[in-house]
């Protein structure tokens, strides 16, 4: 069992799953302190790593200070089947829960998911929504059997390394949300026009350049001890700008600018034409 | 001026239902995932939006995908009901507030979309359609747009009358078929905390590919679909012109016949014979069916959005080009030194 996890060196986690868990936590029933649910995943065709790509919440009732937990299994099955209709490639790979630590009911849940899981080796994602230590902790566990051979055996939940995975489009959406989360402005959550996005990133670039410039100047003025790694990284960045000879760059630049201006003109003309044609048709009969 | 005043009044009418759409991050991510997965299979992704209406704001808090349309054996309504019932049990908002669809630029505002949205809006008044542009988003610009049909468009579709007169009377034009509703993405504080945790885990360089300079192919695609649409509109225009010619010809013939009749009648009255009524003649000329304006209007709308997209795209490309220029200049200046 353990050998398998070593081969499967990386487990990727899609941010969608985290968003889902937090949403579920915020919508939990009044008398519930935690939420649990099934994790669904598949093999990422690009990287070959296992990817946790989806999840759904379960109805359950937990009893504090005991390992008893009641889960609506019928509901779990129904949800899985409904998900199969839209994402047939996603299989059950484990479960998630919120809480400070692995709960006492985890052993029971592990048994259930070991039956449901294709490889009999479910994973357990734990999210600390109580924000202990001012952080939101996310951990992925797998249960390892331990104990004396032919004797008492128990389960130990050991940590698995996990990495965030997100395809490009997801990152685009995430970047936007991140910006809103980190610097709440007046226009919260507006989807910005393209030009504004480019302007924004240019501004970002400028602040970064200022930072680098300050660093370089300080180093030159012997105020800061030089760091070889930083120096090399800077050198790499500088040399990564390809040198195009002036003539061909002009050519490229001019051709592109011409194309763009032409397109804008055309687009504007077409818009004007549309307006005219509609007005002509809508003209009342004389 | 009168036209502008009219449009203002119209926007007020639509504002009565919903001012803006507030979308949860979860719903956005779910849509992004579903649409891109389907676009890998070259399919159109569609799904339902769940949420609630607060004052004049439509909150989209969750969504679920529709199963692939190829499966005919499944009852789609049944599926939707089951999913909603299941989600309701875990306290997800179960008000069906609209639907989403993946699409590429501009082509989204089609007749099919108008029809479906008409059915949605007549059954649930507040519903919206969210269009997610996969192509644009994979180039680094998140492109989510919410649309609703304007009251005039609904009236027009309800009457089923697509003649130019009906369009004129209802003041429907290509710009007033669909009303775009601004979308705002909002996350709960707990999600925002999670986002800042994610900030450390996610690679920095992802999602910035909108600085890509290779614009020719994109522009080409835009142009190609624009040309297609313009061709379609041209066909419609030709049809309309033909109709006008036929009507004109018929009119002249009618006038001639009427003049002839009047002359004959004058002769008849002078002879004291009974006159032939004009209606007899008019009956011979049956009025021509007026070509419907709906397709042309929708195509115009599509062309309009295409043109807007192209203008937007070009302006940001120009900005990027000028950034590169300054880089190049700096490099050249260094070379000279």
From Swiss-Prot, chain A:
Disulfide bonds: none annotated. GO terms for cellular component: eukaryotic 43S preinitiation complex; eukaryotic 48S preinitiation complex; eukaryotic translation initiation factor 3 complex, eIF3m. Keywords: Cytoplasm, Initiation factor, Protein biosynthesis. Residues 11-147 form the MPN domain. PROSITE patterns: MPN. Transmembrane segments: none annotated. This is Eukaryotic translation initiation factor 3 subunit F-2. It comes from Drosophila willistoni. The gene is eIF3f2.
UniProtKB/Swiss-Prot annotation, chain B:
The keyword Ribonucleoprotein does not apply. Gene3D superfamilies: Cytidine Deaminase, domain 2 (3.40.140.10). GO terms for molecular function: metallopeptidase activity; translation initiation factor activity. Residues 21-153 form the MPN domain. Disulfide bonds: none annotated. It holds the Pfam family JAB. It is found in: Cytoplasm. The keyword Cytoplasm applies. InterPro entries: eIF3h (IPR027524), eIF3h_C (IPR045810), JAMM/MPN+_dom (IPR000555), JAMM_MPN+_peptidase_M67A (IPR050242), MPN (IPR037518). One of its GO terms (cellular component) is eukaryotic 43S preinitiation complex. Component of the eukaryotic translation initiation factor 3 (eIF-3) complex, which is involved in protein synthesis of a specialized repertoire of mRNAs and, together with other initiation factors, stimulates binding of mRNA and methionyl-tRNAi to the 40S ribosome. The eIF-3 complex specifically targets and initiates translation of a subset of mRNAs involved in cell proliferation. Belongs to the eIF-3 subunit H family. HAMAP family: eIF3h (MF_03007). This is Eukaryotic translation initiation factor 3 subunit H. It comes from Drosophila willistoni.
């Amino acid at each position: 069992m353990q050998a398998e996890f070593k081969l499967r060196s990386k487990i990727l986690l899609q941010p969608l799953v985290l968003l889902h868990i937090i949403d579920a936590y915020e919508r939990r029933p009044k008398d519930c302190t935690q939420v649990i649910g099934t994790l669904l995943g598949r093999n990422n065709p690009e990287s070959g790593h296992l990817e946790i790509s989806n999840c759904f919440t379960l109805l359950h009732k937990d009893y504090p200070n005991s390992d008893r937990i009641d889960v609506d299994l019928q509901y779990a099955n129904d949800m899985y089947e409904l998900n199969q209709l839209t994402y047939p490639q996603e299989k059950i790979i484990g479960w998630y829960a919120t809480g400070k630590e692995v709960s006492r009911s985890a052993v029971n849940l592990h048994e259930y998911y070991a039956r449901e899981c294709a490889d009999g080796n479910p994973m357990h994602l734990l999210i600390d929504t109580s924000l202990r230590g001012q952080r939101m902790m996310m951990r992925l566990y797998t249960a390892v059997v331990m104990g004396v051979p032919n004797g008492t055996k128990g389960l130990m939940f050991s940590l698995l390394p996990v990495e965030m995975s997100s395809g490009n489009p997801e990152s685009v959406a995430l970047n936007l949300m991140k910006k809103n989360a980190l610097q709440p402005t007046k226009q919260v959550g507006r989807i910005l026009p393209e030009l504004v996005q480019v302007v924004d990133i240019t501004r970002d670039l400028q602040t970064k350049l200022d930072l680098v410039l300050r660093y370089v100047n300080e180093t030159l003025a012997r105020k800061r001890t030089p760091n070889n790694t930083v120096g090399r990284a800077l050198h790499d960045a500088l040399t990564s700008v390809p040198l195009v000879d002036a003539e061909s760059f002009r050519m490229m630049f001019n051709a592109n600018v011409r194309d763009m201006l032409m397109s804008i003109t055309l687009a504007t003309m077409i818009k004007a034409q549309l307006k005219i044609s509609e007005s002509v048709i809508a003209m009342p009969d004389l | 001026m009168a036209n502008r005043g009219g449009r203002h009044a119209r926007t007020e009418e639509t504002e009565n239902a919903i001012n803006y759409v507030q979308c949860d991050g979860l719903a956005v991510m779910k849509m992004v995932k579903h649409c891109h997965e389907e676009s890998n299979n070259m399919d159109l992704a569609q799904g339902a939006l769940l949420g609630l209406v607060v004052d004049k704001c439509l909150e989209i808090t969750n969504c679920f995908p529709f199963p692939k349309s190829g499966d005919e054996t499944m009852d789609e309504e049944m599926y939707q009901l089951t999913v909603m019932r299941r989600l309701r049990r875990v306290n997800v908002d179960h008000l069906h507030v609209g639907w989403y669809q993946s699409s590429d630029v501009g082509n989204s505002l089609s007749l099919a979309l108008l029809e479906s949205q008409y059915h949605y809006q007549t059954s649930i008044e507040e519903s919206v359609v969210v269009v997610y542009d996969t192509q644009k988003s994979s180039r680094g610009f998140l492109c989510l747009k919410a649309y609703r049909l304007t009251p005039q468009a609904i009236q027009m579709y309800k009457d089923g009358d697509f003649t130019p007169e009906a369009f004129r009377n209802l003041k429907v034009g290509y710009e007033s078929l669909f009303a775009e509703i601004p979308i705002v993405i909002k996350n709960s504080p707990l999600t925002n905390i999670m986002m800042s945790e994610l900030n450390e885990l996610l690679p920095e360089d992802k999602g910035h590919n909108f600085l890509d300079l290779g614009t020719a192919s994109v522009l080409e695609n835009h142009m190609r679909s624009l040309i297609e649409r313009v061709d379609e509109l041209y066909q419609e225009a030709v049809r309309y012109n033909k109709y006008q010619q036929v009507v004109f010809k018929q009119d002249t013939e009618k006038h001639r016949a009427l003049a002839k009749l009047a002359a004959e009648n004058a002769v008849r009255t002078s002879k004291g014979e009974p006159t032939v009524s004009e209606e007899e003649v008019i009956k011979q000329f049956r009025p021509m069916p007026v070509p419907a304006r709906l397709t042309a209007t929708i195509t115009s709308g599509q062309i309009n959005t295409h043109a807007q997209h192209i203008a937007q795209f070009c302006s940001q490309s120009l900005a990027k080009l000028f950034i590169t220029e300054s880089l190049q200049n700096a490099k050249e200046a260094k070379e000279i030194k």
